Amino acid sequence: MARYTGPVCKLCRREGEKLFLKGSRCVAVKCSFEKKSYAPGQHGVSQRVKLSEYGIQLREKQKVRRIYGILEKQFRNYFAKADQLKGVTGENLLRLLESRLDNTIYRLGFAQSRKQARQLVRHRHFTVNGQLVDIPSFLLKPGDIISVKDKSKKLSVLHDSMRKVRDEDMYPWLKLEKAQIQGTFVDWPNRTDIPIQVQENLIVELYSK
């Protein structure tokens, strides 16, 4: 599947805020957004465009897509599935995105970014309930256990990432067992616990047109 392969810092500049797409680098002084927080392009510095209602909704959708690293067609499929579930469609959408295997690996601290998590999954380093899974978009269910294969437990990228994880910072819908290098998707997250600043209702309005 085709994916964006250009400079990810430009995506943050396009949205006008940090999307934390490069892990620890995003909180370091080397972060490009700190030096160039304006939109990319020749006229980015002086560009001040007042967005229409549609433009605001579109930007919100693009922001969520870029945070989770998802293409448009796949994002539409998630929205369609969220719309069929009971409850608030926008919140259902975020819960589905949070239940992706690559996102959960990132949230557990096994990877420093979702992009790195996708690479680790594709390289067959993880199992779910004891079964090898190499599909980053695999959707987890409450009770699913994510483990690192025995042969992969010495990976330097894994330990470099885990050194920065504190137990008290773990997300309430996840359980991390550092000694076993495994985690559990305990339950669906509450919207208030999902740490991304988006107005998902704008996405619902966009797709409802």
Predicted regions and their residues:
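Ferredoxin-like alpha/beta domains used as RNA- or RNAP-binding modules
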Residues: 1-108, 135-209
